[in-house]
Amino acid sequence: WLIFTQQFDTIYSTNLNLWRRTHMKYKGTLIVVKDCNRALKFYRDMFGFQLLQDNDGNMELTNNLYLQESGYWEQFTKRSVIPNSNQSELYFEEPNIEQFVERLETLYPEIEYVNHLMTHSWGQKVVRFYDLDGNLIEVGTPI
């Protein structure tokens, strides 16, 4: 029994390590933008993201957010970018949401809202808007 258990542990351990090395991992979210520098400024101003790497039209930011300019996206995918498509959203939590909205309106008065600041029936305050390139963003208070 001891030999069987040791063999099983060895096989299990080997397979687990192999699985860890070969299976993919989620690494982040890429959003398409017209101008990476303009988008970087927006995400830095509003959310505190910092630039990690700049590859001329492709940027890696902190918190695993990636920016790619629309020209590259359309060249690689052979598909058009569809701003304001409402297919997904970037979600953030902010305990001082009123302050956040005030900063957003001061720095980016042209921002397009989907929902102005509102309170859900469960008590969470949220605001939804598009970034400068039509990517949907939701900011809510922690639940």
Regions of interest found by a model, annotated:
Residues D45-L52, Y108-I111:
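Conserved acetyl-CoA-binding loop of GNAT-fold acetyltransferases
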Residues W1-H23:
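Short, Lys/Arg-enriched N-terminal segments with co-localized hydrophobic residues
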Residues M59, S88, G123-V127:
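Short beta-strand micro-motifs in enzyme catalytic cores
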Residues D35-F49:
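Amphipathic alpha-helical segments
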Residues Q7, L16, V101-I143:
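Vicinal oxygen chelate
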Residues L16-R38, S88-L90:
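N-terminal beta-strand motif that seeds the catalytic metal site of vicinal oxygen chelate
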Residues Q50-N84, L136-T141:
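Conserved short beta-strand elements that form part of the metal-binding/catalytic scaffold
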